[in-house]
Amino acid sequence: MPIFKKTLIVLSFIFLISILIYLNMYLFGTSTVGIYGVILITYLVIKLGLSFLYEPFKGNPHDYKVAAVIPSYNEDAESLLETLKSVLAQTYPLSEIYIVDDGSSNTDAIQLIEEYVNREVDICRNVIVHRSLVNKGKRHAQAWAFERSDADVFLTVDSDTYIYPNALEELLKSFNDETVYAATGHLNARNRQTNLLTRLTDIRYDNAFGVERAAQSLTGNILVCSGPLSIYRREVIIPNLERYKNQTFLGLPVSIGDDRCLTNYAIDLGRTVYQSTARCDTDVPFQLKSYLKQQNRWNKSFFRESIISVKKILSNPIVALWTIFEVVMFMMLIVAIGNLLFNQAIQLDLIKLFAFLSIIFIVALCRNVHYMVKHPASFLLSPLYGILHLFVLQPLKLYSLCTIKNTEWGTRKKVTIFK
């Protein structure tokens, strides 16, 4: 990033944090809301500070036998074809490309893929297409490919994702470090321009990768290698394959949360990292109902795998600390809001209510300050994501925790692609 842009981000962040400190300490003092504010400000400073120290891996990748695995279920036909074409266009050669249809009721996508592979024989010699008769879930679709490949490295790609031509080559640079066992790239919303929700989602994605994963990568412990674009060494996948397919939680089979699960397997062996120069675009939900279903699934996966991560506090304390921070911030926010609403000692009036809403807005701007140099106009929408986060996503997260044993997690039935 040019020094001018980096300086602008730092100065803007310092300015926003200064306002945040004033509103927090002078209006809420040592109350629960004030204490939460202090911890939140500290956490924001740590994450942004670490992200500024982040540098992508460089050098030329070693020679690996790489297999791409693309599971698909009721995917839009053109979307799946575009995904395949983007994988075929990689600058780093792939030994195998597996497309596994997981028992889709709508077979248009897999039929289009089969026609394309049969027609474009010269460029599709290494493409293996498989149709499962029964829908068993993404894990089993991936496992079908894992079990049949002798690759050194597995590239996982979602069926609604476009990966940039050099994405695999850039990811593999991280494997020059033999202690790295998994890596993920940078994700943005392909349909960002569709509506307000997709714009807000893209803002969230950019922060989740450009700040959060960049900060975690500096410690060698990103918590989630994202499904749209990640690589894993063979040693991560094959020894854990049966455990991956048959994972249970509270006595019930687990059908999603595969990205976090595979990342935890990699963490057991070594480092997990983020490579900002490996990029992809993916379709995101454009309807609130679909978006909330997605968030509900992710929330349940977050809580389940967080329990596993916290258990690593002796073997891998950094992973446990990142996880504990995320869980504690969520719980403290719930307590702070409850205290603000029901504790008469705080004496909530219009001024403090306005200050509290201002804090929400400024925190959202702080979280996404780096987005200012990428999409300045969209950056100004950040406070709207703050409102969505506080009044919709946080209650949903609490609901997800309370219903974590419910295995009907709303797997998508249909995906719409936007050009």
Swiss-Prot record:
Its EC number is 2.4.1.212. GO terms for biological process: extracellular matrix assembly; hyaluronan biosynthetic process. It holds the Pfam family Glycos_transf_2. Pathway: Glycan biosynthesis; hyaluronan biosynthesis. It is a multi-pass membrane protein. One of its GO terms (cellular component) is plasma membrane. SUPFAM superfamilies: Nucleotide-diphospho-sugar transferases. Keywords: Capsule biogenesis/degradation, Cell membrane, Glycosyltransferase, Membrane, Transferase, Transmembrane, Transmembrane helix, Virulence. Its cofactor is Mg(2+). It is found in: Cell membrane. Glycosaminoglycan synthesis. The hyaluronic acid capsule is involved in the pathogenicity of group A Streptococci; it may be the major virulence determinant. Belongs to the NodC/HAS family. This is Hyaluronan synthase. The gene is hasA.
